[in-house]
Amino acid sequence: VKLIGYFGPWALIGLLVVVFIESGVLFPVLPGDTLLFVAGMLAAGTAAAAHENANFQLWQLLLFIPIAAVLGGQAGYFIGRFIGLEMFKPDARFLKQKYLDEAHAFFEQRGPFAIVLGRFVPIVRTLVPLTAGAAKMSYGVFTLFNVIGAVVWSTVLVLLGYFLGQFA
């Protein structure tokens, strides 16, 4: 709640920037799930007294958050596609070539539903688009499942917060 309140009248823009960055731009430590849940509660009006500048309309959240998530995922895909292989080194601490090979095998075995499921796992949410791009997953397939994952992920979390906010 403090992070949303920090943005003040720019709370919606701040929320969208966080979602964009966390969805695939190599900064996996942002609290995306929590922010979406709290934003849903704010849309229900439960925390409006504490953060009157951070009021959201439910329709704004349901429209703009998936767009920010899709765009972040697409950016991550292109980062992985065009510079991803250079980022994966055999002796790297985090982005090892072995991880790219394992991710490619994971995508091959489980198909593109891994993209949808990855949305619900912090940190993984940021790395899935990068890995899909670096593993040369089909752009069309990635885009389709990125959109599905972004819409399902954001809608579920925002609506959970919204409905809980109505009963609080």
What are these regions (language model features)?
Residues 148-168:
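C-terminal membrane module of polytopic membrane proteins
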Residues 136, 140-144, 156-159:
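Membrane-embedded catalytic cores of phosphoryl/pyrophosphoryl-handling enzymes
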Residues 64, 68, 145-149, 153:
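Alpha-helical transmembrane segments of multi-pass membrane proteins
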Residues 1-17, 41-130, 134-141, 166-168:
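Membrane-interfacial helix-loop-helix
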Residues 16-35, 118:
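Transmembrane alpha-helix interface/packing and boundary motifs in multi-pass membrane proteins
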Residues 19, 23, 40-44, 157:
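Structural signal for membrane-spanning alpha-helices in multi-pass inner-membrane proteins
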Residues 22-23, 143-145:
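Alpha-helical segments in transporter systems
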